[in-house]
Amino acid sequence: MAKQKKHPTGTIAQNKKARHDYFIEHKFEAGLVLSGWEVKSLRAGKAHLTDSYVLLKDGEAWLFGSHITPLTTASTHVIADPIRTRKLLLNKRELERLEAAVAQKGYTCVAMSLYWSKHLIKCEIALGKGKKEFDKRDTVRERDSNRELQRTMRNKGKEE
């Protein structure tokens, strides 16, 4: 009997810009409808989520702006579109909750990360409210002060 291959674990791609641009209020886990070449590319880690977002229409969720680079060894029979829209699989209750929240002013739905869950590829999407420029500066200032505090705590223990 052939030896089973282990699936890679962990995160495939992250959207770090979304954490900077939005106040994240709630996160959801969604499945993705992918073709074979896309799964192969994701195994190789060839994905980018920068500027990707989720559009809700007709009771379905669609992932826009994600880029999955096709492998050179992929099939030549299928024309690979790296930035095609991909359907997200969510429960009906989750879709209704997202649609109600996005209908409010200032709320949007963004893709945060792609990751492996057992043998399936999942997309973490988040409901967020856009930050203003001064909010972004406050976040950076707060992060820097926390780093400085941690640094002094580490150094204080070494001095004794």
UniProtKB/Swiss-Prot annotation:
One GO CC term, this protein: cytosol
Name this polypeptide is given: SsrA-binding protein
> Member of which family?
Belongs to the SmpB family.
InterPro entries (UniProt xref): SmpB (IPR023620), SsrA-bd_prot (IPR000037), SsrA-bd_prot_CS (IPR020081)
What keywords does the record list, in alphabetical order? Cytoplasm, RNA-binding
Per the record, the GO terms for biological process are: trans-translation
Q: Which NCBIfam families match?
A: PRK05422.1, smpB
Q: Where in the cell is it found?
A: Cytoplasm
Q: Where is this region: Disordered?
A: 132-160
Q: Name one GO molecular function term.
A: RNA binding
Q: What does this protein do?
A: Required for rescue of stalled ribosomes mediated by trans-translation. Binds to transfer-messenger RNA (tmRNA), required for stable association of tmRNA with ribosomes. tmRNA and SmpB together mimic tRNA shape, replacing the anticodon stem-loop with SmpB. tmRNA is encoded by the ssrA gene; the 2 termini fold to resemble tRNA(Ala) and it encodes a 'tag peptide', a short internal open reading frame. During trans-translation Ala-aminoacylated tmRNA acts like a tRNA, entering the A-site of stalled ribosomes, displacing the stalled mRNA.
Could you tell me which Pfam families the record lists for this protein? SmpB (PF01668)
Lineage here is: Bacteria, Pseudomonadati, Pseudomonadota, Gammaproteobacteria, Pseudomonadales
